[in-house]
C-alpha cells in the first residue's frame, strides 16, 4: 500500500507539473491568437507526437518526452535586410546557422501570411506574447501558495528559541558533506547562547537595545553584530529576563539567499521555532519575493550547481539537499509526502500545493533568463529592436528595421544544449541519489 500511495502521489504531482507547462504555453498561445500571429503548433512535450488534433491552422498535441512544451509561431526571424526574403546562404559558421534557420522557416511562409508573422508585430504585442508564459506560472505560483496560506498557513521562523546549539563548529567542518563532521566534538567552544544562559522556549524580545519584531530582523541583528557584545532580553514564561552579556562570534553561517553557501557573520547559536502564519494576497506576495531571491541565486549558479551534482554522483559524495532537481525529483518528493504515514491529509495537501507553487515560481524565473531560446531572450530581442528604432527616430536616422534575432541562434543552441545536458544529469541524479525531504 505504501508503494501504491507513493506512486500515486508522484504521478499526480507530475501530471500537475505538466498541466502547469501546458498553461505556460497557453500564456503564449492566447495573446498570439489575439494579435493574429500565425500559429501552426501547440505542443506539450518534445519528440515523437503521441496524439494531436488540428483545429483551424493550429495543431494541438502531446509529445512523447514530457519535459516541456512549445508554441510554433511563424516568422520568428525576419528576412535579411534589403532582400525581401533571403540572401544566398553564406559560409561563415554563425551566419550560416542564422541563414539556414531563416531558410527553413520561410519555406512554410505563404504570401497571404504577410502581416501575420511574429517579427512584424508591434513591440508591445511581442512583449505580451513572450511575457505570457512566465506570467502564467507566476499566477499559478501565487494562487497555489495563497490557497495554502489561507487554508493551512505558511511556516515562518520566529524569535522563539526552538533549541540551543551546544558548540561553535569550525567553518572547515561546516562545509563538509559528511554529517558526522558537523557534530560537536570535545574541545569545540561553547556557543554564545549557552554562555548567555539562553534556554529552549525563550522568546528574544530585545537585542542590543532594539526591540525584536520578527525573525528576519533578529537574524540580521545577530549577523551584523559580528564579534561585538550582545545584550539580550527574553520573555521566559511570564517574566522578562536580561541574559548575561556575551560577545557573539564570527563563524560560518548559511547565506540568507543561498542556503548551500557558507558566509562569515555574527553567530549566537540557536535554532528559531516555527509557527504557521495565515495571510492574504499581500503576505503571499512578500513570501514570493523572498522565495524569488533564493531561487534567483540558485538560477544564477545553476551550471556550477549541476556540475557539483554530477561530481558528487560520480564520486559518491552526499548530494547537496539544497541543490537543484528535475521534475522527476520534485515528483519523487511529492510521492514521499503522499506516503508519509504520520502526517494528516490536510498537511500532505498543503505541502504538495506549496511544492507545486515553488516549481511554478522556478519555471517563471528560469524563463525570464535573458538568453535565447528562453522567453527572456526573445523579450530582450524585442526590447533591443524597440530601442534601436527609437534612437534612430530621435537622431533623425533611417529606420534600421527589425532586429535580426536569428544571429543569436548559435547562443540559443549552446544554451539549449546546456539545459538539455543539465536536465539529463539532474534526472539521473534524482533516480540514483534523490534528495530526501524527511
What are these language model-derived features?
Residues 5, 9-13, 121-130, 351-355:
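Residue-level signature of transmembrane alpha-helical entry/exit and packing/kink sites
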Residues 4-109, 113, 363-393:
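Small-residue-rich helix-interface/hinge motifs
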Residues 113-121, 168-170, 182, 254-364, ...:
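Functional transmembrane alpha-helices
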Residues 189-215:
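Conserved PDZ fold ligand-binding element
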Residues 24, 62, 193, 201-204, ...:
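Terminal peptide-recognition signature
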Residues 199, 205, 219-263:
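PDZ-domain C-terminal substructure recognizer with occasional recognition of PDZ-binding tails
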Residues 23, 34, 58, 69, ...:
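Internal alpha-helical transmembrane segments
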Residues 17-21, 137, 141, 359-367, ...:
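Alpha-helical transmembrane segments of multi-pass membrane proteins
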Amino acid at each position: 500500500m505504501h508503494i501504491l500511495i507513493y506512486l500515486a502521489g508522484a504521478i499526480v504531482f507530475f501530471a500537475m507539473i505538466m498541466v502547469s507547462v501546458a498553461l505556460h504555453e497557453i500564456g503564449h498561445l492566447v495573446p498570439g491568437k489575439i494579435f493574429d500571429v500565425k500559429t501552426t503548433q501547440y505542443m506539450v512535450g518534445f519528440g515523437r507526437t503521441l496524439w494531436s488534433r488540428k483545429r483551424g491552422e493550429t495543431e494541438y498535441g502531446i509529445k512523447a518526452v514530457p519535459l516541456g512544451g512549445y508554441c510554433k509561431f511563424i516568422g520568428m526571424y525576419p528576412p535579411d535586410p534589403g532582400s525581401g526574403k533571403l540572401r544566398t546562404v553564406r559560409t561563415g559558421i554563425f551566419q550560416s546557422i542564422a541563414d539556414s534557420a531563416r531558410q527553413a522557416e520561410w519555406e512554410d511562409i505563404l504570401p497571404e501570411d504577410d502581416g501575420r508573422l511574429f517579427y512584424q508585430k508591434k513591440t508591445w504585442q511581442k512583449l505580451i506574447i513572450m511575457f505570457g508564459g512566465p506570467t502564467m506560472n507566476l499566477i499559478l505560483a501565487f494562487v497555489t501558495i495563497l490557497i495554502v496560506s489561507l487554508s493551512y498557513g505558511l511556516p515562518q521562523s520566529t524569535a522563539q528559541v526552538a533549541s540551543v546549539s551546544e558548540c561553535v563548529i569550525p567553518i572547515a567542518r561546516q562545509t563538509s558533506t559528511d554529517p558526522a563532521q558537523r557534530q560537536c566534538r570535545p574541545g569545540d567552544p561553547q556557543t554564545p547562547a549557552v554562555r548567555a544562559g539562553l534556554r529552549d522556549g525563550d522568546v528574544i524580545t530585545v537585542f542590543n537595545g532594539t526591540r525584536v519584531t520578527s525573525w528576519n530582523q533578529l537574524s540580521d541583528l545577530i549577523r551584523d553584530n559580528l564579534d561585538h557584545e550582545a545584550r539580550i532580553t527574553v520573555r521566559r514564561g511570564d517574566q522578562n529576563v536580561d541574559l548575561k552579556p556575551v560577545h557573539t562570534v564570527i563563524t560560518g553561517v548559511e547565506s540568507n539567499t543561498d542556503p548551500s553557501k557558507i558566509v562569515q557573520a555574527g553567530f549566537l547559536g540557536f535554532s528559531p521555532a516555527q509557527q504557521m502564519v495565515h495571510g492574504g494576497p499581500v503576505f503571499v506576495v512578500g513570501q514570493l519575493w523572498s522565495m524569488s531571491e533564493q531561487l534567483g541565486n540558485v538560477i544564477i549558479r545553476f551550471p556550477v550547481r549541476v556540475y557539483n551534482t554530477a561530481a558528487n554522483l560520480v564520486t559518491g559524495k552526499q548530494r547537496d539537499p539544497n541543490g537543484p532537481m528535475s521534475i522527476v525529483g520534485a515528483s519523487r518528493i511529492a510521492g514521499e509526502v503522499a506516503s508519509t504515514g504520520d502526517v494528516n491529509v490536510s498537511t500532505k495537501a498543503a505541502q504538495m500545493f506549496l511544492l507545486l507553487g515553488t516549481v511554478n515560481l522556478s519555471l517563471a524565473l528560469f524563463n525570464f533568463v535573458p538568453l535565447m531560446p528562453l522567453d527572456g531572450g526573445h523579450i530582450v530581442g524585442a526590447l533591443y529592436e524597440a530601442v534601436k528604432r527609437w534612437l534612430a527616430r530621435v537622431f533623425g536616422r533611417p529606420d534600421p528595421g527589425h532586429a535580426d534575432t536569428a544571429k543569436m541562434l548559435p547562443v540559443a543552441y549552446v544554451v539549449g544544449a546546456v539545459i538539455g545536458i543539465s536536465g539529463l544529469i539532474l534526472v539521473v541524479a534524482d533516480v540514483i541519489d534523490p534528495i530526501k525531504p524527511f
